């Protein structure tokens, strides 16, 4: 009958509305993670890129005490906003006018005068192929050819240019093919993302290890990678939801970690106060748990605290101790707890009749001048050390499977300390008269 609404019309309308609202609530189509060459991000539009899985978000932000604007990446799901990457940290936008776009096959951030304040600075042979910028599920912001998803052929990626944070799957260290050195630089302060005073960099001479720098001065040394952890960070214990890896080959020397449970957020960060630390999110109370922080001890973790041929022990008084068979170089200064001069041998080495003292649970000495041979074990390492009159100490390069590889020191021994547990065995060469 004309003008009479049939009962199933209402049912159909209600069903349609229900489906519509469900789509609004749960459909991920509203979270866009790509930027094409015809699009842009503007501060005024309040648009952001959101990674698949909604873990990370890229957009513009300003800190609590500043009117300056930055382009950055943060955790999407956390109410306590935590920034993991900042593009223009040392060249902020002075006001709320800023645009991110693709121009000339480069990502470019423009200010209010349309002048570039940050760019990927790429030079490409073929500029005819369209490019796209994409925020990946792991927080990596990449630029690639629009038809090529191969990670090995990204034109540019934020993971190659970290700020103060190392995320899972990021690499810290050298790409030997390109010469790129990936390192961390702290924020100026907790509310200022500009480059701070501290940096954390890999030193690749001999046996690779990381150094914490305060400007041009080394403050702490990680110790070399021993197959499980860095020998100077014994607090970094194996976790069930995380896998660590250190790669050293002809193409790269780099540290990375990955999560076996991607629902857990964990990161390494260099704080504005100069602490390198492992932080993992605790969702039940909404804070970042600090698993460890390095340096831990203000004395024993300080670079070359005790001078050559001496080691630092937190359970001894004073904390600096000469190695067995050594005496303080300047006993008066030593008694005044001025330890920079270190220690000297009691008895000169004879070369042919020397032996070794075993020091347990040690942070290995600085390795920049050490000799490494990963093909031999500890017994052969001892023989090789004894056959070299310049050898002063030796140790395993890898502590797994009972110990493998050989590290030999032929100069002075610097920056050592001992631990209650999880250190390494170090064998120091002594004259027979000094062996106990």
UniProtKB/Swiss-Prot annotation:
Under the heading InterPro entries, the entry gives:
Bulb-type_lectin_dom, Bulb-type_lectin_dom_sf, Pan_app, S_locus_glycoprot_dom, SLSG/EP1
CDD domains from the UniProt entry: B_lectin, PAN_AP_plant
What Gene3D superfamilies does UniProt report for this protein, alphabetically?
Answer: Bulb-type lectin domain (2.90.10.10), Hepatocyte Growth Factor (3.50.4.10)
Q: What is the tissue localization of expression for this protein?
A: Stigma.
Has UniProt tagged this entry with the keyword Disulfide bond? Answer: yes
Residue ranges annotated for the Bulb-type lectin domain, each copy included: 34-156
Q: Source organism's superkingdom?
A: Eukaryota
Q: Which residues are glycosylated?
A: 46, 64, 114, 121, 245, 261, 390
Task: Give the matching SMART domains.
Answer: B_lectin, PAN_AP
Cysteine-cysteine disulfides: 381-406, 389-391
Gene Ontology terms describing biological process: rejection of self pollen
> Signal peptide span per the entry?
1-31
Q: What is this protein called?
A: S-locus-specific glycoprotein S6
Originating organism: Brassica oleracea
Instruction: Point out the gene that encodes the protein.
Output: SLSG
